[in-house]
């Protein structure tokens, strides 16, 4: 039951927002208001901020009053969406604005002195204070997006003022591997190749001004055959083989030692055979 009531209230709010947006478009076409010139708007803003007398557009005189900053609101996607409403924080609404009775309207002046009227209501379903009718027109005029800040202030005579500022949005930044390569140490020890310096390579739209070090690794041919490491005999008769990119040579002393070991093995084998023959003769005589 509670979910059905909540859904019904949400649908009703969407319908009201659509109707109010259509009414605002009709009012805009009927009024045909145009923004004030930039110079006049700037002069009017300075006059209102500093309390000086500024000439009006029709020859009148506007006396600016001191303002009291009330609060700021960072608008959310729903505040600038199609719901046509701005949620006012409860503590600020109850402190600065009058009671949200049926048909209550709040009038604000922007930085150019243009009046803006918003319907001010209290939604019991969500227990929130909102500005509805007129808000979407202000969003379009100020080109508000999620993350922008809306500022509210008031004067001693009871007038309300509204202002805004856009947040700084950073465009998408392409990743440049050239800038990342610049941060690499210049003298790295190559294990299986050599290090060369090349022009910076940029993947995307990065702007790399400094030269970047790019590493090229030379591939090394296999140094081991099926039975082990491949050995080579140099012109001096010394044996050599390649291990991890390094030529390892075996000196003549190693070969001589190997030959001596082979000779010792041959002598031991001959002594062993003669001993076996003598044992066989002695065993035959004993029989």
UniProtKB/Swiss-Prot annotation:
It comes from Oryza sativa subsp. japonica (Rice). GO terms for molecular function: DNA binding; DNA-binding transcription factor activity. This is Putative B3 domain-containing protein Os08g0157700. GO terms for cellular component: nucleus. Residues 71-168 bind DNA. It comes from the Eukaryota. The keyword Nucleus applies. Residues 17-36 are annotated as: Disordered. InterPro entries: B3_DNA-bd, DNA-bd_pseudobarrel_sf, LEC2-like. It is found in: Nucleus. Keywords: DNA-binding, Nucleus, Transcription, Transcription regulation. Residues 17-29 have a biased composition (Acidic residues).
